[in-house]
Design a protein with these regions (language model features):
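Exposed beta-strand and adjacent loop surfaces of beta-rich binding modules
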Residues: 104, 128-130
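Short strand-turn-strand beta-turns centered on an Asx-Gly dipeptide
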Residues: 110, 130-137
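Short coil/turn linker and secondary-structure boundary residues
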Residues: 41, 136-141
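C-terminal beta-strand-rich structural cap/linker in extracellular carbohydrate-active enzymes
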Residues: 143-163
Length: 163
């Protein structure tokens, strides 16, 4: 016979506080859910969810994280989301493209610096029109390409790209 905990576990309380349906970004198994839309008929939903989660679930006060920090996992999710990259499939050296938070970020890699730039400072520009790695258009980026590249440029707009 299956029984419950006898009380509400913290993940359920956290999920009830967030207006994101079943995503529950406070629980690690949900971290990848917004990025799965990149592989669907509606990839534009990824960036809408990322924007909503970053702006509504994370705060700059004493309760910065939605739920407990779990040894840095929520911080790591937020950093990936702010960079505009996400390792959706563990063990596969591919990053899905998301919604960069900053106009420019400089990553200090072992042999060089990688600049990630976007026009994301423009309010409402949540949709990727084009992403270029050293001038070549990309839909996703390999780890090796990131290690060798100089510039990852996101061109964002207010409307999703036309199919």
């Amino acid at each position: 016979e299956a029984t419950g905990y006898g009380y509400e576990i913290h993940e359920m309380s956290e999920m009830a506080q967030a207006p994101f349906g079943q995503i529950a970004i406070s629980n690690q198994p949900s971290f990848h859910i917004p990025y799965l839309f990149r592989h669907s008929l509606h990839p534009e939903y990824t960036n809408l969810l990322i924007h909503q989660i970053r702006s509504q679930a994370f705060h700059q006060d004493f309760q910065a994280y939605p739920g407990d920090e779990d040894n840095g996992s929520l911080s790591a999710w937020y950093i990936w989301a702010a960079l505009g990259l996400y390792p959706t499939c563990p063990g596969k050296p591919i990053y899905d493209l998301g919604l960069p938070l900053f106009k420019e970020v400089l990553l200090h890699l072992p042999n060089h610096e990688l600049k990630i730039c976007s026009n994301s400072h423009t309010t409402g520009a949540y949709f990727i029109q084009k992403a270029r790695l050293d001038g070549k258009e990309k839909q996703e980026v390999s780890h090796q390409d990131l290690l060798e590249a100089q510039v990852l440029q996101f061109e964002l707009s207010w409307l999703p790209p036309q199919a």
